[in-house]
Amino acid sequence: MEKLVIGSRGSELALWQANHIKERLKKECSMESEIRIVKTTGDKILDAPLNKIGGKGLFTKELEELLLKGAIDLAVHSLKDVPVVFEKGLDLACITKRADVRDTFLSVKFPDLMSLPKGAKVGTTSLRRSMQIKFKRKDLDTESLRGNVQTRLKKLECGEFDAIILAEAGLCRLNVQGAKYRKAFSVKEMIPSMGQGALGVEMLKNHKHFITLQKLNNEESAFCCHLEREFIKGLNGGCQIPIGVHANLMGDEVKIRAVLGLPNGKEVIAKEKQGDKTKAFDLVQELLEEFLQSGAKEILEKAQLF
């Protein structure tokens, strides 16, 4: 029997995601598969903030190269890590149903962000999170926090940080409590990254099983995630820049929230649009235009200097 080869990063969370797709392939597509672990640039360089490593696709490039060579059949990604422009010949075969999209505050001593003392050290890998934290609390010190989920939690428990921010979806998937204090931000309090909470399965567009994999697609999640990706694409952005965007369907309407700014919490633009879901992509373009008129491009150019 033919076995599909699934490419995956080697972290516990990445392997959970790959095994999730493996199980669904068997159950819903009657297809056997095996997992091949691949180290990406983002996995190899752990002593520098992600935005300092440079380039797009820090967690996807090596997987995409193997897809193009035919060495793997599909790659399973956290959708938030997937660049909005694909290498020629590649595309997303499916986007899974979203898990919890929220970001979560974790601390050993403090119940929430507002209870942190002045000068407290908050760990995060994300300029987007850092920007929104500093916008709320300019007196806090945000510092780069690299490593897998367990490594980050150990650094918190050892006292290297007063608090850390992680994706709620990752904590839930690994069934991790995290710390004494754990509080998820609402989407309004901290706008997530594009595609946060969803998995993206990438393949060659001409792969014989590309259409088959679309059985794993969740229509609502895919619709919202494509709106978010369209917004990022319009700003020529990537996953390592301080932009948050979240689209949410509410019956026949869609609400799109977005934020961008400097990592130090200055010069922040935050806007939202709501309207008929049949005109959702027009809403994205309107939102983009408002951001551009408010100086979004100039702010993002400045953000690259941080």
From Swiss-Prot:
One of its GO terms (cellular component) is cytoplasm. Gene3D superfamilies: Periplasmic binding protein-like II (3.40.190.10), Porphobilinogen deaminase, C-terminal domain (3.30.160.40). GO terms for molecular function: hydroxymethylbilane synthase activity. Pathway: Porphyrin-containing compound metabolism; protoporphyrin-IX biosynthesis; coproporphyrinogen-III from 5-aminolevulinate: step 2/4. Its cofactor is dipyrromethane. Pfam families: Porphobil_deam, Porphobil_deamC. Keywords: Porphyrin biosynthesis, Transferase. Its EC number is 2.5.1.61. It is an enzyme of class 2 (transferase). The modification S-(dipyrrolylmethanemethyl)cysteine is found at C239. GO terms for biological process: protoporphyrinogen IX biosynthetic process. It catalyses: 4 porphobilinogen + H2O = hydroxymethylbilane + 4 NH4(+). Binds 1 dipyrromethane group covalently. Belongs to the HMBS family. The porphobilinogen subunits are added to the dipyrromethane group. Monomer. Tetrapolymerization of the monopyrrole PBG into the hydroxymethylbilane pre-uroporphyrinogen in several discrete steps. HAMAP family: Porphobil_deam. This is Porphobilinogen deaminase. The gene is hemC.
